[in-house]
Amino acid sequence: MGITKRSKDKAARAERSAGGDKSSSAKPKKATFDTTKKKEIGVSDLTLLSKVSNEAINENLKKRFEGREIYTYIGHVLVSVNPFRDLGIYTDQVLESYKGKNRLEMPPHVFAIAESAYYNMKAYSENQCVIISGESGAGKTEAAKRIMQYIANVSGGGSGDIQQIKDMVLATNPLLESFGNAKTLRNNNSSRFGKYLQIHFNAQGEPIGADITNYLLEKSRVVGQIANERNFHIFYQFTKGASQQYREMYGIQKPETYLYTSKAKCFDVDGIDDLAEYQDTLNAMKIIGLSQQEQDNIFRMLSAILWAGNLVFKEGDDGYAAVSDQSVVDFLAYLLEVDPAQLVHALTIRILTPRPGEVIESPANVPQATATRDALAMAIYYNLFDWIVERINLSLKARQATTNSIGILDIYGFEIFEKNSFEQLCINYVNEKLQQIFIQLTLKAEQDEYAREQIKWTPIKYFDNKIVCDLIESTRPPGIFSAMKDATKTAHADPAASDRTFMQSINGMSNPHLTPRQGAFIVKHYAGDVTYSVDGITDKNKDLLLKGVQNLFQASQNQFVHTLFPQQVDLDNRRQPPSAGDRIRTSANALVDTLMKCQPSYIRTIKPNENKSPTEYNEPNVLHQVKYLGLQENVRIRRAGFAYRQSFEKFVDRFFLLSPATSYAGEYTWTGSYEAATKQILKDTSIPQEEWQLGVTKAFIKSPETLFALEHMRDRYWHNMATRIQRMWRAYLAYRAEAAIRIQRIWRKKRVGAEYLQLREEGHKVLGGRKERRRMSILGSRRFLGDYLGINATTGPGAQIRNAIGIGSNEKAVFSCRGELLEHKFGRSSKPSPRILVVTNSKFYIVAQVLNQGHVQIMAEKAFPLASIKFIGASTARDDWFSLGVGSQQEPDPLLNCVLKTEMFTQMKRVMPGSFNLKIGDAIEYAKKPGKMQLVKVLKDAPTSQDFYKSSTVHTQPGEPPNSVSRPQPKAKPVPPRPITKGKLIKPGGPGGRPARNANPNRTAQPRPGGGPSIAASNPLASSAAAASSRPVPAHPGAAATPAAAKSLPSHTRQQSSTSTVRPPPPPPPAPAAKPKIMAKVLYDFAGTRENELSIKAGDMIEIVQKENNGWWLAKTPEGQAWVPAAYVEEQAPAPPVVAPRPPPPPPPAANGGGRVAPQPPAKRPVAGRKPAPAPAVASLQNRDSGMSLNGANGSGSDASRSSTPTPSIAGSLADALKARKQAMAKRDDDEDDW
């Protein structure tokens, strides 16, 4: 039914107006094929996975990582895999392509997340936040910087103040990275703190200010690092790049001088230039607005921290701590502007207040004094970092009214180590709070959309982790943080006693997500169970900055020290200061309050490997990250309702091609509303009703398979058009190719390859079962081709080698390949060097290629007459090393390495005059020096499959047994007959251009009309094949009245009149005698190890069903039918066949057109690479050699065309028909010879 357009019909216009169409210009444009479309790797959105599992997610991420696609969506969540290389995807051109684009219009990218957040902030006046999580080295900081880069680029604002704010926001990155990042084992630029950057915008979407909140600074890194890690970057930048003024004022020396920077013995990092980054840090300070005085104060405190680390204590005469070097104390006191005696007193005397108004001073031992020194250094750096963040916020403070904001959270991901302590508890607690935000915001938004669109759906079930958050942060009943603080109060002087008290509190808690253990406890987080060790956990929670140290800071004459430590010390106040857990709980709740007021976007970062390799993808490690990031849960939550949703307009624009009612030749022809067009498309594509729903403004699709089907149909639309154009051309090319291939195939079977196989078998005899073999050496496809480099060729690289080394015209190369020669150098280890090995009918050449003045020069390094080679030495292992025992008095014997050694030995044996001596032993014998024999040991201890030589020893791996022979020759994969085309007509495939017949070798004669039952009558497959190749035969006299007989005549044959006299057809020839069974006697026992191998015992008689040239015969016993090795059995002479009496000859007038039964083609060979599967039934053998016809109902094949000779007259029609049949059958016999 055609589509009627009534563009001037008022009713139609009214209908379109009611349907929501704004104007005629809003309809989709004419569809055109996208020639720049890039083939998608995997799926770009994990919600479209057919099977949702951690393994399926991991496999999809791997495909995209290997295809240089590092970004993948989970709905609105972005998953990012660190590429460890520059992919060129952050250029200004790429950034411009994402401006103003919808998330679905462009491939997944961090710019798309930034664009979505900025667009939603402006369009809906909603505060936005981007939450970035993942393990160290996964790319969190890089993602945060790219979001800031995009927002700074697209947010406009040409005024100087706006540009200044943008510059300061971008300058915070190098500054905070210097003070908050460090080199770890897993990441050279690891963020050791969390931050939340909030950019404020005015009503026009221009940035007018920002503020930063920092979390969880790893201050313990200041005083200690594990091996091959570093302190914070700023210490190495400062000690390497400090000006001469700073070196004189603050005594700055190289990082090797200070304990805090040299403890881990790591001073430089690949890819990090400390001097250049120090200048970037100073420049960032200037952009943010730090004065020179403020910069001096910062570096003064850094110097104090470095010198504090060099303050070493020793045990005094009284048994307590004493200072080892007073000069360090004096210089540290100078930097802090305190009295040296007061400094020593603060570090070596502990102030206790057991009762109000009572102060007790207790001397400290060496470990206690060292801990106090480290606490002083950590306190200075921790407060200095907080001051820098506050100073940045002061410079970035908005100077006009703020409308909305975009927040970027870059924080630790879940941490699960072998030993987890207080730090991991705090990090995982913050992640639990972030997961709580995800549950409340994301799932709630999902439910609101379904309700707004009036969609019928099943409520999403999810785990509410509020119970876990309460377990950690609750005060009534006490949670983990509160119990930790109470334990510190109870036994504040003894950390071990505090830990025991805390463990008692844990044992008394009743919570399904808490499990006490011996000296530990398990918390069931949403990302998995984590076991936390109690040892030392309370000591990390309490404030280690003693009141004596606080008194020291208050006594300082430096105003900046007072700024860092503003609180006054009240000696009478016994109330504990806020613990680390208290501060984490307060800041986490403040962060949650801020994020709950925002619309979130999520970025999950993944680290593909631990080696920072751009090509390695460590599947187990990534799978672990997929699990603890909860990607599978994210996908299931997204798919719990509908996997795909889109507005009516965009859905129609994408899929209108799929319905003939909405499109014609790529043009959009629908005149109704978009909602009606959407419904029509889904109806015409036969999408089940339960797979989709239409809301108020959007179409919802349930499963990703449905969306895949729609996308597939859309892609096939263009392919089908191209297929129509290509079909006839391909048919002609197929005819030419098939004709050439069939000619070549028959020629190769008869002529090519026999001599190479015979030479390969001779190679086994040369080794004589004395040397282990490599698996590749005994493959069935291995051929001994000899001249691999083409030395005998007249042109090409081989001819160049021949001319360069002077091989005479009377010499013929029998073998050539590349190998190695062991070179002995004075004072140095022997080293294999590449060489070219050439064996001619008279000499053995060792050819070297050297670089001479920029040109490659080929020369014959050594040339040995074959007659001079007394022996060839090799080992019994599978290695490729061998020696040539020349026995020269002037030069040593060469020790060579050649992967084709067996073939080389075989060729040499064929052409060497005299005897061929191959010495195979446990070691390789050769003359390392003239007249001095040496043995090269061979050890089977190589860590890899690659052999290597070291210190007169060849290291290899165990090989195949020495008595191994070549595997059976793999068979070519059976290819179904292809259609042979001639002009515009397509003929069936198979030999001779006709359908191939059944491959059953035991089949009886072809059925004859009027004959008895046959195989074709009982086998549907054989029956159909026989019907396709049957010839018309005249009916018996009197059979015309039978409807079946009448139907058997072809339509072009005249009907016989009742008065005509036609001789009856001759009787059919007797069925050929049954083929005698081939029996064989078992010579040796054989135990089958595979399903298609038959176990046999010596002395048994078995029937041979089929023989193959690959050394395997198909045998049959009462136990079953399978393959046995031909070498294990001996064929027995068959019994003489019983000759059936021949029938009397037919009457002379009648021509015997029955012909003989055409011989059957041999069964096809099994699939290449393995033995053929057993063929227990006749039907399976028939299927193996079945033909393929492409004619269908257009005809019965070429045989039918040959049997359709019209009858010239009624008289003699029988004789002519039989004669034509005989000729056709004779031609068929000729065709059989091709097989």
From Swiss-Prot:
One of its GO terms (cellular component) is cytoplasm. One of its GO terms (molecular function) is actin filament binding. Residues 9-19 have a biased composition (Basic and acidic residues). Residues 1075-1134 form the SH3 domain. Residues 405-487 are annotated as: Actin-binding. Residues 773-962 form the TH1 domain. Residues 41-715 form the Myosin motor domain. Residues 1063-1073, 1135-1150 have a biased composition (Pro residues). CDD domains: MYSc_Myo1, SH3_Myosin-I_fungi. One of its GO terms (biological process) is actin filament organization. Residues 719-739, 740-765 form the IQ domain. Residues 1050-1062, 1180-1210 have a biased composition (Polar residues). ATP binds at residues 134-141. Its main location: cytoplasm. The myosin motor domain displays actin-stimulated ATPase activity and generates a mechanochemical force. The tail domain participates in molecular interactions that specify the role of the motor domain. It is composed of several tail homology (TH) domains, namely a putative phospholipid-binding myosin tail domain (also named TH1), an Ala- and Pro-rich domain (TH2), followed by an SH3 domain and a C-terminal acidic domain (TH3). Belongs to the TRAFAC class myosin-kinesin ATPase superfamily. Myosin family. This is Myosin-1.
